[in-house]
């Protein structure tokens, strides 16, 4: 009897493997951090071989910890950091360059050049749902082809392959037999036409990217191929679900209905609203993306991305050394009644939605002689909630929907002070599920549905359960005063870097 699904969760700072049973309980988790490479100011890279070795290592480790063999595994689902770009040699399987990470800003100049062509810029937004930005994969691929010796010649001969991290992992798991992605990951490349559901020839021509490099685009839930976890002669396990991390979280939160909203507090913050079959073009700095692709049909989503969410807590711990453990931030923040007039704007890599300012930089405002470390810690936590409020306001305006309830997940969602402040500053109910590993759970759902482990979305939704509900409890005048202070602080940091 195949009792389990394994979700591979390949994130920005670590690779994880999580085993779920049929009742959606977590049997075991393994995690391994890997190296962050910063070769130049604003550049961020990963070693693709280390992404693979760390991910495969935790897969083997989690099975050993749980004492299960491949005979017990119904399927594997994959979820991944999105936009991160890997180009490798089709014949040798060797990457031609490090993975260029979604946070990397090296292609800002390429983007500025493209933006000068207003018609092209509008075309990109209209057809990919995205705005021209260094965040997405397209200009990263172009950079590799233009800057790695011999890469363009090889690409034009059909010898190089491109993939986001999901594609790379499937390629490696199937020993180079399968080169695929899913609708959600394709929609983050800035090369995929989300209306026609195909790679966009006009954008490929403009960026001089050969079509032969690109993977085949599949549903988010289907059997893509098989991997043999037991070596030669072992049982082949289907790889059966795949979606970008934020779309997996939306699915894992059972946001199946139009108008449902989730916010993930990871390295960044990512607010997504399921818009069903409607492509809503944002006028407020959000992007339109594919929420999920099932049985050849897609649902769309509005998305707002904050570059630095939970990462501000790591900064408080690692750089400022104000705490030794990220979990201690709540304890210290509670030692003061309010932020003491202090605001932290964590624009370390620029500002994401709704501002999209690559040249903004971080700052602390409102310091007085009475400000202490607890005020700064509290202000850093509050910054996560303020940035999420920015996204919620933009989403309300774009969608015309009143948002009364947000499902939350990710590491920082375990911080009760932050979640209560999130409810207070937005005036919305904040709901945290029992399982906050919703990204991995979404990947497990997708894989499980493909192989009949779970029969339907309805069966999945019945088992989803709530741990905590935070209701707004802040005076309206105070809410306005606090948020106005945030908006003043954000104005000050914009355009800082020349």
Swiss-Prot record:
The gene is glpK. One of its GO terms (biological process) is glycerol catabolic process. Belongs to the FGGY kinase family. It comes from the Bacteria. Key enzyme in the regulation of glycerol uptake and metabolism. Catalyzes the phosphorylation of glycerol to yield sn-glycerol 3-phosphate. InterPro entries: ATPase_NBD, Carb_kinase_FGGY, Carb_kinase_FGGY_CS, FGGY_C, FGGY_N, Glycerol_kin. Pathway: Polyol metabolism; glycerol degradation via glycerol kinase pathway; sn-glycerol 3-phosphate from glycerol: step 1/1. It holds the Pfam family FGGY_C. It comes from Clostridium acetobutylicum (strain ATCC 824 / DSM 792 / JCM 1419 / IAM 19013 / LMG 5710 / NBRC 13948 / NRRL B-527 / VKM B-1787 / 2291 / W). Sn-glycerol 3-phosphate binds at residues 12, 82-83, 135, 245. Glycerol binds at residues 82-83, 135, 245-246. Activated by phosphorylation and inhibited by fructose 1,6-bisphosphate (FBP). GO terms for molecular function: ATP binding; glycerol kinase activity. Homotetramer and homodimer (in equilibrium). This is Glycerol kinase. It catalyses: glycerol + ATP = sn-glycerol 3-phosphate + ADP + H(+). GO terms for cellular component: cytosol. The lineage of its organism: Bacteria, Bacillati, Bacillota, Clostridia, Eubacteriales. ATP binds at residues 12-14, 267, 310, 314, 411. SUPFAM superfamilies: Actin-like ATPase domain. ADP binds at residues 12, 16, 267, 310, 411, 415. Keywords: ATP-binding, Glycerol metabolism, Kinase, Nucleotide-binding, Transferase.
């Amino acid at each position: 009897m195949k009792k389990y699904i394994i979700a591979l969760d390949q994130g920005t700072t670590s690779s994880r493997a999580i085993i779920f049973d049929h009742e959606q309980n977590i049997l075991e988790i393994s995690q391994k951090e890997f190296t962050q490479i910063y070769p130049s100011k604003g550049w961020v890279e990963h070693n693709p071989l280390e992404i693979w070795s760390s991910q495969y290592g935790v897969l083997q480790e989690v099975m050993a910890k749980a004492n299960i063999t491949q005979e017990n595994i119904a399927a594997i689902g994959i979820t991944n950091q999105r936009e991160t770009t890997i180009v490798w040699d089709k014949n040798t399987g060797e990457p031609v360059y490090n993975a260029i990470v979604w946070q990397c800003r090296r292609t800002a100049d390429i983007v500025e050049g493209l933006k000068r062509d207003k018609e092209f810029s509008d075309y990109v937004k209209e057809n990919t749902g995205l705005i021209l930005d260094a965040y997405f994969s397209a200009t990263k691929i172009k950079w590799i082809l233009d800057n790695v010796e011999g890469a363009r010649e090889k690409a034009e001969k059909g010898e190089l392959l491109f993939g986001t991290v999901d594609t790379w992992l499937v390629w490696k798991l199937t020993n180079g037999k399968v080169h695929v992605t899913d609708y959600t990951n394709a929609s983050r490349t800035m090369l995929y036409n989300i209306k026609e559901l195909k790679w966009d020839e006009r954008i490929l021509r403009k960026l001089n990217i050969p079509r032969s490099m690109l993977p085949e685009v599949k549903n988010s839930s289907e059997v893509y191929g098989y991997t043999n976890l037991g070596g030669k002669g072992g049982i082949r396990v289907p790889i059966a679900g795949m979606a970008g991390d934020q779309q997996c979280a939306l699915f894992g939160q059972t946001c199946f209905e139009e108008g449902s909203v989730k916010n993930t507090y990871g390295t960044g913050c990512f607010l997504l609203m399921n818009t069903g079959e409607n492509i809503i073009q944002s006028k407020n700095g959000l992007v339109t993306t594919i929420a999920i692709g099932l049985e050849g049909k897609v649902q769309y989503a509005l998305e707002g991305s904050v570059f630095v969410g939970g990462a501000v807590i790591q900064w408080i711990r690692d750089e400022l050394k104000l705490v030794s453990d990220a979990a201690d931030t709540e304890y210290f923040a509670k030692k003061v009644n309010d932020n003491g007039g202090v605001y932290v704007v964590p624009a370390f890599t620029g500002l994401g939605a709704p501002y999209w300012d690559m040249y903004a930089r971080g700052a602390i405002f409102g310091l007085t002689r009475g400000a202490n470390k607890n005020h700064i810690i509290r202000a850093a936590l509050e910054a996560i909630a303020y940035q999420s409020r920015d996204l919620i306001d933009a989403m309300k305006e774009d969608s015309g929907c009143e948002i009364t309830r947000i499902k939350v997940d990710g590491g920082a969602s375990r911080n009760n002070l932050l979640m209560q402040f999130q409810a207070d500053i937005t005036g919305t109910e904040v709901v945290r599920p029992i399982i906050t590993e919703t990204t991995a759970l979404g990947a497990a759902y997708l894989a499980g549905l493909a192989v009949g482990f779970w029969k339907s979305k309805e069966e999945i939704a019945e088992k989803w359960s709530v741990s905590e509900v935070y209701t707004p409890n802040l005076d309206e005048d105070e809410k306005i005063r606090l948020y106005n202070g945030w908006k003043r602080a954000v104005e000050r940091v914009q355009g800082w870097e020349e």
